[in-house]
Amino acid sequence: MKEFVAISSLESPEHAMRKDPRIISVQWFIGKRCNYDCSYCSPFIHDNYSSHIDYKKAIQFIDNLDRHCTNQGKQFKISLTGGEPFVHPRMLDILEYISSKPNCRALVITTNGSLPLEMYTKSLKWVTNLTVSLHLEEGDKTTKSTVTKIIELNKSNRFINVNLMACPGHFDTVKQTAKQFDDADVKYVIRKIEPPTEDFALNTKTKKEGQTAVKNTQEHAKEKKAHRNYTNTQFQKLLTTYYSEDEWNYLQSLENSEKWQNMRLWHKDSSFTEIHSDELKRTMTNSFKGWVCYIGIDSINIEADGTVYRGVCLAGDPLGNINNDLVFPEEPMICPIGWCTCLSDMVVRKSSTEEYRELIE
């Protein structure tokens, strides 16, 4: 891959046409409650008992965000994740309210695809992008049902895309499903799973009498940051021990076959290359420690307890909480993280030095 010195996003026409997109991308981890229990998913980010976010508090934050955007002359793109967002009893009401705000440029939600087709179809009245993470540990019957729903939803005029999770031991299903998606013209990415590094025994995903959470947000943030600072060698070792040799070779053989590109790599001569962020992860060129990064300016991340950070990486101090005062940053920051592994953080504007900021400003 040709050396690059800056990055900008292609996640919307505004991002593609303007160096400063004037859009705040909001990643909102709206709740831990989930109806799946994937082996590779941290107990901190999913369980079957956490309370749903209070509807009134959710509406209050949406109003505050819309007001901030008006004051800044910006719009917002908001992405809801979990847990499983659709298990919230008022999720459709929340989606409708978000879409009604004047500054809402895009509304994205990620789901495991397990809810009824009718619910997803109704959500498309307000959602501009529906992302389905297809997990393969739920059995063939569930997988086939979810694939059928995905293909049906893909007939809508909304942007539907799939994260086809490359689960160890299920690569025959991965390949078969990929062919089905190719035949149905479904946009998808075969997503390499990041091996878990924390001790799952420290927390539990199932409700027990008298149970209290072992970890709080701050403790989990430390673990998350430590994981991002793994060296190339450490990360490579994790992956090659998580997957079998054949599975690993298959993942390494995949080319950048996505049907859309979501980021622009800028080179020293001001030329650029458009690729998908997964290609950076595949080639392990997603380390930006020491770069100037615009998380907090172009993006914010909200954790399950309402704590707000600049990005999903949790770099820097918290900006506040959606239930209290929230101070938006005015300047980009120097990246302190070893590896940028979340798509939403990877596509945020960044430059290797101050010299190359002009490419993205």
Where are these regions (language model features)?
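Glycine-rich short-loop/terminal segments
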Residues: S42, R67-C69, L265-H267
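Conserved, mostly hydrophobic/aromatic
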Residues: C34, C38, I109, G306
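Flexible mid-to-C-terminal extensions adjoining Fe-S/redox cofactors in radical SAM and related proteins
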Residues: M1-I24, F44, S287-Y294, S299, ...
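Radical SAM/AdoMet-radical enzyme domain recognition
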Residues: I59-L80, H88-F181, K187-V189
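Short catalytic/ligand-binding loop motif for oxyanion handling, primarily in non-cytosolic enzymes
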Residues: D37, N48-S50, V87-P89, E118, ...
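Canonical Radical SAM [4Fe-4S] cluster-binding loop centered on the CxxxCxxC motif
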Residues: H15-K57, V312
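Radical SAM enzyme [4Fe-4S]-AdoMet core and its adjacent flexible, acidic
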Residues: N129, S133-D298, A304
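Short cysteine/histidine-rich metal-coordination sites, predominantly Zn2+-binding motifs
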Residues: I53-I62, E355-I360
